[in-house]
């Protein structure tokens, strides 16, 4: 998957999980501030991303993912070819 496809998938998952319009899920959007996710939302979102992209995101790494762009960066860097 290229970066654009990963962004699109993360936008779809985030919009679905948080019940927001996909147009609000911009790369610079903060999960907590802009998209109003709480801690449980974030845990569930990370689990969905792990499943969607077939990867494990350790808790200490998940805590560093605060924006949509950071989620995209993480997936791009850690996806298996």
UniProtKB/Swiss-Prot annotation:
It comes from the Bacteria. GO terms for molecular function: acyl binding; acyl carrier activity. It is found in: Cytoplasm. GO terms for biological process: lipid A biosynthetic process. The modification O-(pantetheine 4'-phosphoryl)serine is found at residue 39. Pathway: Lipid metabolism; fatty acid biosynthesis. It holds the Pfam family PP-binding. Keywords: Cytoplasm, Fatty acid biosynthesis, Fatty acid metabolism, Lipid biosynthesis, Lipid metabolism, Phosphopantetheine, Phosphoprotein. 4'-phosphopantetheine is transferred from CoA to a specific serine of apo-ACP by AcpS. This modification is essential for activity because fatty acids are bound in thioester linkage to the sulfhydryl of the prosthetic group. Residues 1-79 form the Carrier domain. InterPro entries: ACP, ACP-like_sf, PP-bd_ACP. The keyword Lipid biosynthesis applies. Belongs to the acyl carrier protein (ACP) family. Carrier of the growing fatty acid chain in fatty acid biosynthesis. This is Acyl carrier protein.
